[in-house]
Amino acid sequence: MDHDLEIFPLLSYVLHHSDPASHAPPSLAIQQSLANRYPLLTNPYVISSLIESIPSTITQTLFVFGSLGPRPDPLAVSSARSKIREIKENDSLSPEDAAKEEQVYAAVVSLEEVHEGYEKQLRDLEEEIGRVYASAVESLSGGDEVNEEVLAVIKDAEDGGVVERIDLSDHELKLLPDALGKIVGLVSLNVSRNNLRFLPDTISGLEKLEELDLSSNRLVFLPDSIGLLLNLRILNVTGNKLTLLPESIAQCRSLVELDASFNNLTSLPANFGYGLLNLERLSIQLNKIRFFPNSICEMRSLRYLDAHMNEIHGLPIAIGRLTNLEVMNLSSNFSDLIELPDTISDLANLRELDLSNNQIRVLPDSFFRLEKLEKLNLDQNPLEYPPQEMVNQSAEAVREFMRKRWEEMVEEEQLRSVIEAEKQQGGATGWLSWGSSIVTSLFSGGTHGGAAKKPKNSFLDEQL
């Protein structure tokens, strides 16, 4: 468990539900205690409200708090403070000597004060979560969150009406009723630009749903049941507060477009690419993603990938398998993206590549193999190869420069191989060459040692 979070049970519980991979769950005893004290804690609306109340700086706060080490013993702190007072009251000590003696005791007091400061931050946050819980429960009891238009649509469907498309965008919705999942004939659902914090699990009942627009809401997580939408082709969750996508999303095998941009994602599900084999467009820009899962290389249908403004450290070695990829934007990953794998040159259909605002110094030697590349942006990189004057010309100029560089490297390698082979051959047959030279000298009338020689007979030129 995170450092000392046992004393902040509510915070511990919410952190685990917001990011299970980074935060361990509270002990069973604490979970039972929380269930008794907060009976609606598992309600989707309530837990989403609590997750939303967690500040984005909590990760840094917990990291610093955890790196402080053990808290000083209270008796040691009290003793240190007494010693500091004694030193200050001792007039016989010079200011320099007093400062030296105070230094050891001041370190103990300072560490205690830092602990107190961070613990107060977490305690205040624990209390704030409690207040948010009370407010969320009160909102639930109000019963006025379900829009009348939503209820009318559901009633129409229950009365036998055929409802294929629902557009409830800009309706200030706070929640969707469970009964929405009963509209089995629904093909398109647009609930963008509302105040939704969660989706009901019953959304899995929309078996024919092909388009789902959840953009510009306040969602902090997606239900696992979303993986049961087997006919879903377009999913838009941009502009929410998602910190992760459920593993079950890989089961949406019909998905063609996924827009998860402008969230708080730090990673993608490990199995992401194994299921989404039909995905053509993936937009994950404006997140905090550091690495792509290796499974993304299995998404052979992918044509468009936008991952700009993240914290991408590099691409998987097998990225070259995305042979249908046409557009890739990796710009503005700043100090995190410093190199590209050689396999990027296997992206045979790549037409546009944006690598601006990174820390790339050298392009892969095989970069010239991107024959279809038309647009290349390398602005704001500390490039050494190719030189900036080539970069300023065109993608074709860069490609041609890298081609010539490659040919020169091949020639150098071939020459090196020939020289190495001759060295090895010379070492293995040196005695034979020496013996042959003596025989040649004798037959030609010369002497071994450099005297003038007559023309050699041609048969002596044959390899022994």
UniProtKB/Swiss-Prot annotation:
Coiled coil (residue ranges): 106-138
InterPro entries: Leu-rich_rpt (IPR001611), Leu-rich_rpt_typical-subtyp (IPR003591), LRR_dom_sf (IPR032675), LRR_domain-containing (IPR050216)
Pfam families reported in the protein's UniProt record: LRR_1, LRR_8
UniProt entry tagged with the keyword Coiled coil: yes
Sequence ranges of the LRR repeats: 160-183, 184-206, 207-230, 232-252, 254-275, 276-299, 301-322, 323-347, 348-370, 372-393
Disulphide connectivity of cysteines: none
Gene Ontology biological-process annotations: microgametogenesis; protein autophosphorylation
Tissue specificity remark: Widely expressed.
GO molecular function, one term: protein serine/threonine kinase activity
Origin superkingdom: Eukaryota
Keywords: Coiled coil, Leucine-rich repeat, Repeat
GVYW, short sequence motif: residues: 398-406
Record family assignment: Belongs to the SHOC2 family.
PANTHER family xref list: LEUCINE-RICH REPEAT-CONTAINING PROTEIN (PTHR48051:SF54), PTHR48051
Function recorded in the entry: Leucine-rich repeat protein that likely mediates protein interactions, possibly in the context of signal transduction.
Protein name in UniProt: Plant intracellular Ras-group-related LRR protein 3
Organism: Arabidopsis thaliana (Mouse-ear cress)
Gene (name only): PIRL3
